[in-house]
Design a protein with these regions (language model features):
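Intrinsically disordered, low-complexity segments
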Residues: 2-4, 20, 33
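Bacterial N-terminal signal peptides
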Residues: 14-25
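Accessible peptide chain termini
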Residues: 1-2, 485
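Bacterial N-terminal signal peptides that target proteins for export
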Residues: 2-16
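Short linear motifs centered on Gly/Pro in flexible linkers and helix caps
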Residues: 4-6, 23, 39, 44
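Formylglycine-dependent sulfatase
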Residues: 28-439, 443, 447-485
Length: 485
C-alpha cells in the first residue's frame, strides 16, 4: 500500500511538473512573439527624408528611427503605384498574381492568404488604419470608375483584420471632411472613413478634423494600448494618405517653411506632419514597454508623384534616381525603408541588400513559425529577411521582379534588366538616359541608370531575360487561378 501511494505521488508530481513546464513554455513563446507594425507613406519619394539627404525637409522622427534601426539603402515598393504595392505587403506576392495591376481597379482576390489571417491564427490581434485601396468599402458605391462596388467589395475585415478604420482611397491631408478638400469630383462621406463596416458620415461632429495623419494615429494608438493591456501580440497596419494629393498643409506646419514657395510649403508641411505621428507612435511603444520586441517597419508605396521643379504641390523628390511614380526606373520604386526592432537589430545599421515590400510576409511568417513551403502550389515572390537581420549580408538569393504600366524589370544584386514594352518615353521618366526595348544597368556603378550595358554584357542580359520570362510565365498561371485550385 505504501508503495502504491509513493507511485501515485510520483505520478502527480510528474503531471504537475509537465503542466508547469508547458505553461512556462507557452509564456516564453508568447513573450518571444514580436508585435508587428507596418507603416507606409503614400507617394513619398526616396529623397523626401532628412536621413536620405533632403536639405530642407524636417523629418526628425524618421531620421531618429533610421539611426535606431536598420536603414535599407535599396528598399523597393512592390510596384510603381499604390494598390499593387499594398497587396504585396499583405500577401508576399506580386500584383500579377493577385489581380490588381494598377491603382483604383479590382480587388485583392479572396483566394489570397493575408498576413492578418495567418497572424490571427497565431493569436495576434490585427488592426488596419488609413488608406486601404485593395477594394471598395461599400457594396453599392465607389468613387473610382475602375471599380465595381459590388464585385470589388473587399474590406479589411474580410481579410482577417479584427479592427479597422479605413478609406477606400486617398483623402485630403488636412480636414478631410471639409467638402472644399474633397479628393473626388464631388463630396461623399462614403469615400472617407469607415470604421468596422460603418461609414463615419459626419467626421466634423466626431472630431476628425485637422491633420489626417494625426486622425489615423489617434485610432491606431488606442488599438495598440488595448492589445498590450490584454497581453495579446498585435499586428498593426498604418497606411498614411500623406503626401498624396490633395496636399494641404496645416498652419503650424506651413509656418516651419517660411522661405519656401507656397507649393513647397504645403508638400513639406504634410511630410513633417506625417513624421510627427511616427514620433508619437515610437514614444507610445516605449511608454507601453513594448518597443523592444516590436518590429516597426516604415516605407512608401511608390516613388513621388512629381518632382522638385513641378509647378504645383507635387514637390516630391526621388533623390538622384531616374523616374518617379508609375515608372520602373529606380525613382519610381526605390523608396525609404527602415526596420526598428531593438530586440534583434542593433542601432545604426545600414544595408545595401535589395529588399522589397513582398518580403514582409515571409519575414513575419519566419518569425512566428509559419512554414510557407507547406503550400507548394502558391509561389511567393518575397523572401524572409531574417538571415539579413540576424547575420547581415548584401547578396539577395533571388532577383526582384516587377511588371506593370508598360514596363517589366528584374533587379539583382548588381545588374537590373529593364524591358520597355513601348519605346515612347513615359511622362514618369525624368531621366536623361536612352530608352530602348531592352536595357541593362549596373546599379552599383550607375544607380542613376544612365548607361545602357545591354550590348556590352549580352550574356548577363540573356540570362536575366530568361529568368524574367520564367517569372512572367509563373505569374500568368497564378492570374489564371492555378494557385487556388
Amino acid at each position: 500500500m505504501k508503495r502504491s501511494r509513493s507511485i501515485n505521488h510520483h505520478r502527480c508530481f510528474q503531471i504537475l511538473l509537465f503542466f508547469f513546464l508547458s505553461l512556462f513554455a507557452f509564456e516564453v513563446a508568447y513573450a518571444a512573439r514580436p508585435n508587428v507594425i507596418l507603416c507606409m507613406a503614400d507617394d513619398l519619394g526616396w529623397g523626401d527624408t532628412g536621413y536620405n539627404g533632403h536639405q530642407v525637409l524636417k523629418t526628425p522622427n524618421l531620421d531618429a528611427m533610421a539611426r535606431a534601426g536598420l536603414q535599407f539603402n535599396r528598399f523597393y515598393a512592390g510596384a510603381a503605384v499604390c494598390s499593387p504595392t499594398r497587396g504585396t505587403c499583405l500577401t508576399g506576392r506580386h500584383a500579377s498574381r493577385f489581380g490588381i495591376m494598377t491603382a483604383n481597379q479590382g480587388h485583392l482576390r479572396r483566394g489570397e492568404i493575408s498576413l492578418a489571417e495567418v497572424l490571427g491564427d497565431k493569436g495576434y490581434r490585427s488592426g488596419h488604419f488609413g488608406k486601404w485601396h485593395l477594394g471598395t468599402l461599400s457594396s453599392d458605391y465607389s468613387g473610382k470608375k475602375g471599380r465595381n462596388p459590388k464585385a470589388d467589395y473587399l474590406t479589411p475585415g474580410m481579410v482577417g483584420f479584427d479592427t479597422w478604420f479605413s478609406t477606400e482611397f486617398a483623402v485630403a491631408t488636412w480636414d478631410p471632411y471639409d467638402p472644399a478638400n474633397a479628393h473626388a469630383s464631388s463630396y461623399d462621406s462614403r469615400l472617407l472613413y469607415w470604421e468596422n463596416g460603418v461609414n463615419v458620415a459626419d467626421g466634423l461632429a466626431t472630431g476628425l478634423t485637422g491633420c489626417d495623419s494625426r486622425i489615423i494615429m489617434d485610432k491606431a494608438l488606442p488599438f495598440i494600448e488595448s492589445a498590450v493591456a490584454d497581453e495579446v501580440p498585435f499586428f498593426t497596419v498604418i497606411w498614411f494618405h500623406a503626401p498624396h494629393e490633395p496636399i494641404i498643409g496645416g498652419p503650424q506646419y506651413l509656418a516651419m517653411y517660411p522661405q519656401e514657395t507656397t507649393n513647397r510649403q504645403h508638400y513639406f508641411a504634410v511630410v513633417t506632419a506625417l513624421d510627427e505621428q511616427i514620433g508619437r507612435l515610437r514614444a507610445k511603444l516605449r511608454e507601453l514597454n513594448v518597443a523592444e520586441n516590436t518590429m516597426l517597419w516604415f516605407c512608401s508605396d511608390n516613388g513621388p508623384e512629381g518632382n522638385p521643379g513641378a509647378m504645383n504641390r507635387r514637390q516630391g523628390s526621388a533623390g538622384e534616381f531616374r523616374g518617379r511614380k508609375r515608372s520602373l526606373y529606380e525613382g519610381g520604386i526605390r523608396v525609404p525603408g527602415i526596420l526598428e526592432w531593438p530586440a534583434q537589430v542593433e542601432a545604426g545599421r545600414q544595408t545595401d541588400y535589395p529588399a522589397v515590400t513582398s518580403d514582409y510576409f515571409p519575414t513575419v511568417m519566419d518569425v512566428v513559425g509559419y512554414d510557407l513551403p507547406r503550400d507548394k502550389r502558391r509561389p511567393y515572390d518575397g523572401l524572409s529577411l531574417m538571415t539579413l537581420i540576424e547575420k547581415g549580408g548584401t547578396q539577395r538569393p533571388r532577383a526582384i521582379a516587377f511588371a506593370g504600366l508598360g514596363m517589366e524589370a528584374l533587379s539583382g544584386n548588381q545588374y537590373k534588366l529593364v524591358h520597355n514594352l513601348s519605346e515612347k518615353r513615359q511622362r514618369s521618366d525624368n531621366g536623361k538616359g536612352e530608352r530602348t526595348e531592352w536595357e541593362l544597368y549596373d546599379l552599383i556603378d550607375d544607380p542613376r541608370e544612365t548607361t545602357n550595358l545591354i550590348a556590352k554584357y549580352p550574356d548577363i542580359a540573356d540570362e536575366m531575360k530568361q529568368e524574367l520570362q520564367r517569372w512572367l510565365k509563373s505569374c500568368q498561371a497564378s492570374k489564371q487561378g492555378a494557385d487556388y485550385r
